[in-house]
Amino acid sequence: MFPWLRLFAVGLSLIGKSKVDLLATTRVRLRVWPNDLDFNLHVNNGRYLALANIGGAHWFVRTGALGIFRKHKAFPVIGGAIAKFRHDLKAFQTFEIHTRLIGWGSKWAFFEQRFVRKERVLGVVAVRAVAKAQSGSIDPQVLIAELGHNAPSPELPEWVRRFDQSAELLGELLRNEERSKVVDQHSMSALGQERTYAVQTATSASHLIATAKAAACTRSYLLHPRQRTCAVQTPMSAKGQ
């Protein structure tokens, strides 16, 4: 089933369901369909991220976070993800996605999503997400407080801190590469302008010299009409060749 249809079906299943605590683990049950499979006849690695989005949407509704986001006209943006695959999911097997909020900082909130079948963890997806609004990013603590949770974030596990650090380092690397490309483009543009100016200057100088020689030749002919005409190309005649 296409993820959007799955998402719609999950939304219908949530009608009338009560809210759960912000730090509770939400569970949504799904089934593997043929379009989830790759050539090895198990769920494609990239498909796990699409399925994890469904688990994330389920968490947003069950905890009431969706209403708070709407109030602020904000939307969640994933700024990094890692995945660990342990066992296969095959066609038509049922499984659950267990989603929980691990903790948060001044910008990012961290989620863990486990793919579970018969109480066995088949894989894990972890993401860091930020709340975006027209005014910019919203501090997670502001949104979490509006959900009635005033306590500080639980301590982040070591692997989550390393994941966050790795994402920051990679982001900085990409930003530096973009800056280098911009500098290189500006340098090439400036070099091209310098070359164009040099060519224009040389051309202007050549025209001035040719014009001066033509004027001297004309003056000599007027003073000494019986002498042979000077063989000097004027700028106009040079251009026509």
Feature annotation, model-predicted:
Residues M1-G16, L22, L89-E96, R100-D184:
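HotDog/MaoC-like acyl-thioester-processing domains
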Residues L14, G79-R86:
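Short structured motifs
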Residues A24-W33:
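Short amphipathic
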Residues R47-R70:
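Active-site helix/loop of acyl-thioester processing domains in fatty-acid/polyketide metabolism
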Residues Q233-G240:
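Short, intrinsically disordered C-terminal tails of secreted or membrane-associated proteins
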